């Protein structure tokens, strides 16, 4: 093939890096866990032991035990302090003051007055107490006792009582004899109450038997001439477009 077919300086060459349009699947979008290191290692792969170099441990400077911090005097033995007793000079303590009992002159019998002698009662005028107006004790008028007059008392015997009403027209001198009730005025009891009751029937609307109310297709609703599935049929072809292999799927959310 000569170089006359190519126009310009562009020539077919291998791409330097992967082109996303070459892949129909997300492909490199998913980051698989690595097989090296300790962090984010693939759990389905064997992981070799990993070692790290750290700094040197510091030696504890502060000792928790008292150690030689105690200053034991030289005259202290297992039985106590050894040596002669030592004394120190200190001031004299103060004497405790004695209780001063009151004498006869401390009392004033003349001031006893009402406490030691009989005296007449004395009264003083003061203002009215505040609790007097808020006394909630009910008085005699607060109780609603039932009346003892009339026949409404169940535990008391009541005398006969009478009431006055108007004069009845029945049997009086001005009774209208033309208003005698006729046969239609009386309410006749149904004989079926106290005699043998015959059967009773009522007429109602015709009941429709339950069934399927959907519309069933008739013979004219079918088109047997349009059925081609039961007959031999030639293959059918359709014209479509050719999809490019460089069309990449739409990736909206891409993790950084």
Swiss-Prot record:
Pfam families: SHIPPO-rpt (PF07004). InterPro entries: CIMAP, SHIPPO-rpt. 'Shippo' is a Japanese word for tail. Residues 91-115 are annotated as: Disordered. This is Ciliary microtubule associated protein 1A. Belongs to the CIMAP family. Keywords: Cell projection, Cilium, Cytoplasm, Cytoskeleton, Flagellum, Repeat. GO terms for cellular component: cytoplasm; cytoskeleton; motile cilium. Outer dense fibers are filamentous structures located on the outside of the axoneme in the midpiece and principal piece of the mammalian sperm tail. May help to maintain the passive elastic structures and elastic recoil of the sperm tail. It is found in: Cytoplasm; Cytoplasm, Cytoskeleton, Flagellum axoneme. STPGR repeats lie at residues 66-92, 181-206, 217-242. The lineage of its organism: Eukaryota, Metazoa, Chordata, Craniata, Vertebrata.
